[in-house]
Amino acid sequence: MDQMLSPNFSIPSIGTPLHQMEADQQIVANPVYHPPAVSQPDSLMPAPGSSSVQHQQQQQQSDASGGSGLFGHEPSLPLAHKQMQSYQPSASYQQQQQQQQLQSQAPGGGGSTPQSMMQPQTPQSMMAHMMPMSERSVGGSGAGGGGDALSNIHQTMGPSTPMTPATPGSADPGIVPQLQNIVSTVNLCCKLDLKKIALHARNAEYNPKRFAAVIMRIREPRTTALIFSSGKMVCTGAKSEDDSRLAARKYARIIQKLGFPAKFLDFKIQNMVGSCDVKFPIRLEGLVLTHCNFSSYEPELFPGLIYRMVRPRIVLLIFVSGKVVLTGAKVRQEIYDAFDKIFPILKKFKKQS
């Protein structure tokens, strides 16, 4: 055995490993951090004898000799990494960025790009996404592009106008009830001699056995008045509120000319009657069965269906031909509101021809 081994070979002891540790398994007491080399183009590589090359060589030597390891001080970095300076972008760079932003906002553009996302948000740039395509193309570029776009928006949209009130959706806009009669009352505040009025006034009649009031008529406005001995007067037949008041004043003037101290107090409209035509026949039998709580229909007594509306408090006379009479209103709007509510109900009971 000793003859087979070389004279310089010695058998290791039990505690000595047979194999040496590999290079990647060895623990270095003070490792040195070497930054990765960055490949640079040939045009950017410094000359061999330049000062930058010498500076890098000195830096590497100092890193290899001095304790700037992982467990000691931080590794020294190149000077370019230590000092960072900020420079204002040039005018050409700003123009290039603005052109890229406008191209991204154009109709054929591909939306937002990283360059456009890095640009500061201004009111003009924020409104550019809200403008229609036609106005973006007309808006122009540069500093005045935002103002031109805003002016184009105002020109396209036109001046702002007050919103018109919406018409009732239930009623047909082509059907509007027309006022047929207005009944009003007034107090003359004096006792009247009805025989004297009937003898001296024109177009007046008085028959106490039939009716205890003087019936007087005038042509303009075409109305009829009922004059009582207590001084109360009822005016009927006017087509509007103003005509009813004018007619009542004319009757009071006639009484004054006959020698009575008549006044004109407490004028009030008591009833308004309107009518309209829905232009289609109506199944009154089905309507009275469905709305039995509000309507009554006795064709043997009266050919129309009587519909008593609760709100507004209006009474409607509905006929099979489609004619509708509305009565009991104090103001004109109540007639319009009642018709707007009854019209969709009548459409449900339209006769199928």
UniProtKB/Swiss-Prot annotation:
It is found in: Nucleus. Residues 49-65, 85-106 have a biased composition (Low complexity). Sequence repeats lie at residues 179-255, 269-346. Keywords: DNA-binding, Nucleus, Repeat, Transcription. Signal peptide: none annotated. Its main location: nucleus. One of its GO terms (molecular function) is RNA polymerase III type 3 promoter sequence-specific DNA binding. Gene3D superfamilies: TATA-Binding Protein. InterPro entries: TBP, TBP_CS, TBP_dom_sf, TBP_eukaryotic. Pfam families: TBP. Residues 20-121 are annotated as: Disordered. Belongs to the TBP family. Belongs to the TFIID complex which is composed of TATA binding protein (Tbp) and a number of TBP-associated factors (Tafs). Binds DNA as monomer. Interacts with TFIIA-L heterotrimer. Interacts with Taf1, Taf2, Taf5 and Taf12. This is TATA-box-binding protein. It comes from Drosophila melanogaster. The gene is Tbp.
